[in-house]
Design a protein with these regions (language model features):
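Beta-strand/loop-rich accessory regions of lumenal/periplasmic or secreted enzymes
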Residues: 244-434
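Extended substrate-binding grooves/exosites of carbohydrate-active enzymes
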Residues: 1-253, 257
């Protein structure tokens, strides 16, 4: 939709190209309950709408024609196709032949392919785009909407950016969209929060469907932004960040010699009982419970830190895009596994004065079943390493997450995270800095 003129001025000054789009959107007339049914659609080829939509094109062009930032005109959004929108294109071409015209809706009716100067689609899969680009097309390709950044999402951006580097005719895409639409209000607890649909007592609402930006409504960056920043940088800048991360990871993975006096290691005292294994060192002690499926106690300087035995974690809160593709139902077995994981026994792998290593084995009630292990390594210097191991099995549903639930006795205020910055996931981690 046309924006306020100040935004166009800023784009002119900062070298930001834009597609200027008329305020035309009518997908409610031809898209019924998600299905395409264009037997009656607006504006279509209805003569009573033709002058109206051409007037919208004229108003936008006359207002914005002198903005250097405007690279392309767009006839509108999600309004199917027909003679009326074709008339808009003809007006743009006649009045301003220096600029191209964009429109996505012709993908639903190729009889009106002449409306647009480029192939434009929404949310096309990378292999669909590749298929188009390999077919020796006459028109360049643009994704007028992609990534669908609802809530905490925007995974898999790499697949699209790499297309732009491989195919000259792939012109990139527009993330849907930039900023959440939300309003400050006071919630039932008296807190000032950003509210969306349903937070204001209304019953007919789209709920959080307005929360689709890469920044929040107050302009603060959402977790996805660090990956957007990474993939929208030049290939050279991305390579530089990858090199920095590789060096940092290599340094973190090796033992660094301390410049001053090394910490003295006191021999570990190991006590083996029928139901427990005790490990005691300088200022710390641990108790591993055979029956309790993990550590029963972790004390440092006499203070207990462990609330309950750690457990493997297989579930996380579902996101908007998860729910949109039915993922919570497909992966529901992992929610059950997260709660009902079975304990299969403890094995002492090593028990000496310098190191104690204990393995706890778990069965995962998926179909087919799987297994996991938590391995605790206690070193004489007082370090505790926890390794979580999941043994994958063919045929199991997609795994939402894998980690360790580690509940402490009270809040922990002094922690150091060694890993990637921000919120990362297998398909959204390249922007993280080590």
């Amino acid at each position: 939709y046309p924006d306020q003129s100040l935004w166009y001025d800023l784009c002119d000054k900062n070298g930001i190209y834009m597609i200027d789009e008329t305020n035309l959107e009518s997908h409610g007339s031809w898209q019924k309950l998600g299905a395409i049914e264009p037997s009656w659609n607006v504006p279509g080829s209805l003569p009573e709408w033709k002058d109206c939509v051409v007037d919208r094109a004229r108003s936008m062009l006359e207002r914005d024609k002198n903005h250097a930032a405007v690279l392309i005109w767009s006839c509108g959004n999600e309004s199917y196709a027909g003679e009326d929108i074709l008339a808009m294109t003809q007006f743009f071409h006649a009045k301003d032949p220096s600029r191209l015209v964009h429109y996505e809706g012709v993908v639903h009716n190729r009889a009106f392919a002449a409306i647009t100067d480029m192939e434009s689609r929404m949310y096309a899969k990378p292999w669909e785009i590749r298929e188009y680009l390999e077919s020796k097309p006459e028109k360049p390709f643009i994704l007028c909407e992609y990534m669908h950044d609802m809530g905490n999402s925007l995974g898999g951006m790499e697949s699209y950016v790499k297309l732009a580097e491989e195919y000259p005719q792939y012109q990139g895409g527009f993330i849907w969209d930039y900023m959440d639409q939300a309003i400050w209000h006071t919630d039932v607890m008296g807190r000032k929060v950003l509210g969306y649909g349903g937070d204001f007592g209304e019953r007919t609402t789209d709920y959080n469907f307005s929360g689709n930006g890469i920044v929040y409504a107050d302009g603060a960056e959402k977790p996805a932004m660090q990956d957007v920043r990474y993939w929208y940088a030049s290939p050279a800048d991305r390579a530089a960040q990858d090199a920095v991360n590789a060096v940092a990871a290599a340094q973190a993975d090796r033992t660094l010699a301390e410049a001053w006096q090394s910490r003295r290691a006191y021999p570990l005292v190991v006590t083996q009982g029928d139901g427990n294994l005790g490990v005691k060192g300088k200022n710390f002690e641990m108790l591993f419970s055979i029956a309790g499926a993990g550590p029963a106690s972790l004390k440092v300087n006499g203070t207990e830190w462990l609330w309950r035995a750690p457990r493997p974690a297989f579930w996380r809160a579902s996101t908007d895009n998860d729910r949109g593709c039915g993922f919570p139902l497909r992966a529901a077995a992992w929610m059950a596994a997260d709660v009902f994981v079975t304990y299969n026994g403890m094995k002492v792998l090593e028990a000496g004065p310098d190191c104690v290593k204990v393995q706890f084995q778990f069965g995962i009630p998926t179909v087919p079943g799987a297994s996991a292990e938590l391995v605790y390594t206690v070193e004489a210097q007082g370090a505790l390493r926890v390794d979580a191991v999941y043994h994958g099995v063919a045929g199991a549903p997609e795994l939402p997450c894998f980690g360790v639930k580690f509940e402490t006795f009270g809040p922990v205020t002094r922690t150091v995270w060694t890993g990637l910055s921000g919120e990362t996931y297998p398909d959204r981690y390249k922007g993280g800095v080590f």
